[in-house]
Regions:
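N-terminal accessory targeting/assembly segments
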Residues: 1-79
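P-loop NTPase nucleotide-binding module
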Residues: 111-112, 117-170
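Charged, alpha-helix-enriched surfaces in structured cytosolic catalytic cores
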Residues: 16-19, 51-58, 76-82, 86-89, ...
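P-loop NTP-binding catalytic core
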Residues: 46-47, 57-135
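Residue-level signature of catalytic and energy-coupling elements of molecular machines
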Residues: 24, 94, 221, 225
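Flexible glycine-/small-residue-rich
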Residues: 26-28, 36-38, 87-89, 96-98, ...
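Conserved beta-strand/loop subsegment of P-loop NTPase cores
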Residues: 229, 257-262
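Switch/coupling sub-region of P-loop NTPases
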Residues: 163, 167-251
Length: 264
């Protein structure tokens, strides 16, 4: 049964979110914008309040203070003009001028935590996902619930006593503590490949497959018979497969993908 996401810890961003807020969009000297979640709609809501540059600077400092004070918070990307952090349930992107025309903060968090039963999958599909499919892609547009579905499927694999590892950037999947979460922040694709090939998990969750090195790593892991559960952006199911074309040899694709789950 699905449930509202709640954290045992408190964060400064809690002041900007309620139970229906999916994302927060802040730009210096502009009104605060939130996206709200309802079962059939995702509505942008603009506040009358304008957030100043000084308030943005203070908020950013609080975010960094919280990121360095907790074990499970991460600074995933640290560039001169952009930062990506995982702060509890919040995925935070901070961008500075001149990359952007003003200081910007975008914070996203999951609204609901689901179980696989919430998706009302047919017995045939459940049997496929749990007993047969080993080369799975989960696709659709950003914000469509791909990662939420993956979390529910990972829970099933964990309950079946499979060894699971994830590759994420940032590490924002909400999974059991038994699941090891890797990031490219401190590792190269080659290093992650070596670790996974040596540790031999039953399943590797790749959230998400974006660029050529990702496609190559996904292929290499799959061809060594590691179960793969990949997340990819695509507007149609066939696009999920077409995105692999040009990144890996076409004749290998049937050996890398056997199932596409399209979140519509």
């Amino acid at each position: 049964m699905s449930e509202t996401i709640k954290s045992d810890k408190t964060y400064v961003l809690d002041n900007y979110f309620d139970e229906t807020t999916m994302s927060l969009h802040l730009k210096a000297d502009r009104p605060i914008l939130r996206k709200k979640w309802t079962p059939w709609n995702r509505n942008p809501v603009m506040d009358e309040k304008i957030i100043t540059q000084d308030e943005m600077d203070a908020l950013i400092q609080q975010i960094f203070d919280e990121a360095t004070n907790e074990k499970w918070n991460y600074l995933e990307i640290d560039r001169k003009l952009s930062k990506v952090l995982q702060l509890g349930p919040y995925r935070i992107v901070i961008v500075y001028p001149p990359l952007s025309d003003a200081t910007e903060i975008t914070a996203v968090r999951p609204v609901k935590k689901t179980t696989i039963e919430d998706y009302n999958l047919s017995p045939e599909v459940m049997d496929l996902l749990t007993n047969h499919a080993k080369w799975i892609l989960v696709s659709w547009a950003p914000g469509s619930g791909k990662s939420t579905f993956v979390q529910a499927l990972v829970l099933v694999y964990h309950q079946n006593h499979h060894i699971i590892k994830t590759i994420e950037s940032p590490r924002d999947l909400m999974v059991d503590e038994d699941v090891v979460q890797y990031s490219f922040t401190h590792w190269t694709h080659d290093e992650v490949r070596d670790i996974l090939l040596l540790s031999r998990p039953d399943y590797t969750v790749y959230d998400e497959v974006r660029n050529t090195p990702d496609f190559e790593l996904y292929k290499d892991l799959r061809l060594t018979w590691i179960g793969m559960l990949g997340v990819i952006h695509a507007t149609k199911p066939v696009d999920s497969i077409q995105r692999f074309i040009g990144c890996i040899e076409m004749w290998i694709i049937p050996q890398v993908i056997d199932t596409v789950i399209f979140i519509d």
